[in-house]
Design a protein with these regions (language model features):
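Generic preference for hydrophobic/aromatic residues in regular secondary structure cores
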Residues: 3, 12-14, 104-105, 126, ...
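Surface-exposed patches in mature extracellular/periplasmic domains of secreted proteins
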Residues: 93-119
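Short, low-complexity, polybasic intrinsically disordered segments
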Residues: 113-157
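Detector for Asparagine
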Residues: 9-10, 34-35, 51, 101, ...
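Active-site-adjacent loop/helix surface patches within enzyme catalytic domains
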Residues: 1-96
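Polar/charged alpha-helical tracts
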Residues: 42, 100-101, 105-109, 125, ...
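Generic hydrophobic, helix-prone segments enriched in Leu/Val/Ile
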Residues: 30, 97, 150-154
Length: 157
């Protein structure tokens, strides 16, 4: 749940790389929720992509597959609360920041979390502003995934 600032606000961070395009990097900020992402279940154990075992209490079972994976390294309650506070803090600094559109709006309209967190052409092309995830603008990314606690936090913004 610790927030780390990587560079000053007045600098442009090309946080989406070559695939993400310049337009969206210019008009967006990047926040990274640190974890190992998807997990592979082998027997009754769960493993990260680097073959490190994850204890069951740190496993999020979505109950469905998101980007081909059902099991994920869970975000902690502290991470989700820190993210919520950071989003609200950034909204205070940047009043034009759009929290009404993007993933929160889709979730509030009843779109299934799996779909709300998927690639969105309008987000990718910077045609629809709002709160998005790496997965909204990159087909090769796995963060963020729709963990129930994260979904509920975003719906509550």
């Amino acid at each position: 749940g610790v927030v780390v600032k990587c560079f000053p606000n007045n600098y442009l961070g090309w946080h989406l790389g070559k695939v993400g395009g310049f337009a969206i990097s210019k008009f967006s900020g990047g926040v990274e929720l640190n974890n190992f992402g998807y997990l592979t279940k082998k027997g009754d154990k769960y493993y990260t992509y680097v073959n490190t075992e994850v204890q069951p209490e740190y496993v999020c079972d979505l109950g469905y597959k998101f980007r081909g994976h059902q099991y994920w390294h869970a975000y902690s309650d502290k991470q989700i609360e820190s993210l919520r506070l950071l989003i609200l803090h950034l909204k205070d600094i940047y009043p034009k920041m759009d929290l009404e559109n993007g993933i929160p709006k889709m979730l509030k309209e009843g779109v299934h979390p799996k779909e709300a967190f998927e690639f969105n052409e309008d987000a990718y092309n910077a045609k629809q502003f709002g709160l998005w995830s790496h997965t909204s603008v990159r087909k090769d990314k796995f963060d963020c995934f729709p963990q129930e606690e994260l979904v509920n936090m975003l719906k509550g913004l």
